[in-house]
Amino acid sequence: MKLKCLLVDDEPPALKVLAHHLSNINGTEIMGQCKNALEALDVLNSKPVDLIFLDIHLPKLKGMAFLKTLSDPPAVIITTAYHQYAIEGFDLN
C-alpha cells in the first residue's frame, strides 16, 4: 500500500524539490501538487490523501487557516522556515 501525499506550496521550486524527493521513495504516491489551499481542498474532496506537505505562506488562504478548516485532516508536515508556525502546526495535528 502506498502513502498518498498531497503537496501544497505556492513556490514552484519548492513543489519541484518535494516531488523529486518523494518520487525517489518507494511506497509513496503524489496525489496532487497545489499552489494554494483552495486547490488542495479540491484534491482532498476528490482523492484519498494520507499525508499533506503544507506550506504556511499561501495565497488566498494561509496554511494554518486552511488546516483549521479540516475536520478530520490527514497527517500534515508543515513546510516553513518559521519555528513558531511549526509549533502551532504540531499542536493542530
Model-identified regions with their sequence ranges:
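Two-component/phosphorelay signaling modules centered on CheY-like receiver
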Residues: 12-32
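Generic detector of well-ordered alpha-helical packing
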Residues: 10-12, 56
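CheY-like receiver
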Residues: 41-43, 47-93
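Short alpha-helical segment
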Residues: 36-40
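Non-catalytic signal-transmission and effector/linker regions of two-component phosphorelay proteins
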Residues: 1-4
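Conserved sequence signature across two-component system core domains
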Residues: 8-9, 34, 52
